[in-house]
């Protein structure tokens, strides 16, 4: 599991996205937006053999913990600005679906 410290070491948060701050391998270049967008519009980041949803890493970066569910307040999965993310239970998260 990725840690908050690793996120700060390898990524820079800007405008709702994470950018590579330190090169991990030959795929992500420094200054480049991390990950790739899936069919729903969520960005998925590969890090040390595991895949993470960008919005979950951003939430962990700012809050220091990972809840079971994270809701995009505006229902836009590609908007991962910290002010658009909130901890939610299953019912709250489903309400926005």
Each model region followed by its residue ranges:
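Short, cationic Gly/His-enriched loop motifs
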Residues: 48-97
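Short helix-coil boundary/hinge micro-motifs
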Residues: 1-43, 47
């Amino acid at each position: 599991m990725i840690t908050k410290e690793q996120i700060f070491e390898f990524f820079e948060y800007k405008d709702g996205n994470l950018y590579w701050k330190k090169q991990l391998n030959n795929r992500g270049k420094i200054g480049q937006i991390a990950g790739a967008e899936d069919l729903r519009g969520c960005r998925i980041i590969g890090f040390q053999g595991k895949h993470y949803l960008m919005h979950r890493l951003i939430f962990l970066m700012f809050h220091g913990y990972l809840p079971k569910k994270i809701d995009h307040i505006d229902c836009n999965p590609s908007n991962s600005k910290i002010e658009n993310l909130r901890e939610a239970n299953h019912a709250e998260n489903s309400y926005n679906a």
